[in-house]
Amino acid sequence: MKYLDLAFANPAHNLACDEALLELIETGQVKDEILRVWEPAQYFVVLGHANARRAEVNLFACKEDRITILRRMSGGGAVLQGPGCFNYSLVLNGAAHRFRTVREGFRHVLERHRNMIQTLTGFEVALEGISDLAIGARKFSGNAQYRKSRALLIHGTFLLDFDLSLIGRYLQLPSKQPAYRQNRSHLEFLTKLPVRSAELRERLQESWSARTALDKIPIDRIDMLVQQRYGGKEWSEKF
């Protein structure tokens, strides 16, 4: 597996990068699977592909604080990105025959991450709902996926040294909730991992045997996707 540690200053470029990496494997330009990690330097909101802005986001607070609202290609709920939110992206090949269902794809990734975090922290980690990792029924990792015919993108977050109090300012309670949430507030529902980002990077590389640097970074395609989709209101405000 190839490894890429790359964060862009422009939030939209970080979303476009995942799609561009997915295209590399889907089109056969890169044969190896890819692990990317990145950490944002600023706060911004990311909607799931089908999320309605008004239902999921406090638009007034975001406007008042100049928080950018973007939309990703994958499903799932809205998230607040920012310092202390550690992101990973896995681009896997052979999606059509290896992972026939969305649940199979998540289980392949999240069971490995569950074992990794249990070993790292000593805490009992549970796979909750279809795509969450939690400790004591409090979520620390949310994940989403996007499937193409030959490749699969699974990406997600780990809450590390993140200011959880900000989530309730910028995000509404989600319109769709897993049963284990039980309508709890963001502060009651979420927790942070007592792990340093450098340590998590190392463990992810070990878990996925991702030691060789990706030397084909599709910068031009990333720029094009920002111009055509991720950087525009037509995409981010479509719902």
What are these regions, as identified by a protein language model?
Residues 66-86:
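Glycine/serine-rich anion-binding loops at beta->alpha junctions
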Residues 59, 65, 83, 87-210, ...:
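Catalytic beta-strand/loop module used to bind and position nucleotide/cofactor moieties
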Residues 1-56, 60, 64, 72, ...:
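Active-site loop/lid in soluble adenylation, ligation, and acyl-transfer enzymes
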Residues 51, 73, 90-94:
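Generic hydrophobic/packing signal
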